[in-house]
Amino acid sequence: MAEVHVIGQIIGATGFSESSLFCKWGIHTGAAWKLLSGVREGQTQVDTPQIGDMAYWSHPIDLHFATKGLQGWPRLHLQVWSQDSFGRCQLAGYGFCHVPSSPGTHQLDCPTWRPLGSWREQLARAFVGGGPQLLHADTIYSGADRYRLHTAAGGTVHLGIGLLLRHFDRYGVEC
């Protein structure tokens, strides 16, 4: 079986109006992919930017996959949350990006968005917090369902990813 090693980090985020940010992340693959080592999902620590608007997380990602086919290439899905002084968490944005398919190091910028909801939900978000959230996480990367949503742009999550490919030549795939 061909193997893919994804090694890197979620560096941080910029462009969010909220402070005290953290990121929940996960990786989604097709049925032909098997996770050999690493964890499929995780969460960063909370960071409050002191200078500028960059929240730094430097959260490690280390995944090792085996695959029988290229369908369902791995993609990272991200949820950025903010935490207020009372410890309440509110969604700041959803985003996703495909893991690059070429070996080497890659700097990825993942734009985020959040659902707007009705004007009442927007007003409640401004004064009380909270706001609408997706019921199913796969809507983040499923374009068919996403087009019906009214959304607002969030910030950008920055990732540094290193990719190693092994035994792809045995299966006729040139990298």
Curated annotation (Swiss-Prot):
Effects seen without this gene: Mice expressing reduced levels of the protein in the central nervous system and kidney develop perinatal triventricular hydrocephaly, polycystic kidney disease, lack functional intact cilia and die at the time of weaning.
Tissue expression notes: Highest expression in thymus and skeletal muscle. Also expressed in spleen, kidney, lung, heart, microglia and liver. Detected in brain (at protein level).
One cellular component term from this protein's GO annotations in UniProt: MKS complex
A GO biological process held by the record: cilium assembly
GO molecular-function terms, A-Z: gamma-tubulin binding
Every C2 B9-type domain range: 2-118
Function: Component of the tectonic-like complex, a complex localized at the transition zone of primary cilia and acting as a barrier that prevents diffusion of transmembrane proteins between the cilia and plasma membranes.
Quaternary structure and partners: Part of the tectonic-like complex (also named B9 complex). Interacts with TUBG1.
Name of this protein: B9 domain-containing protein 2
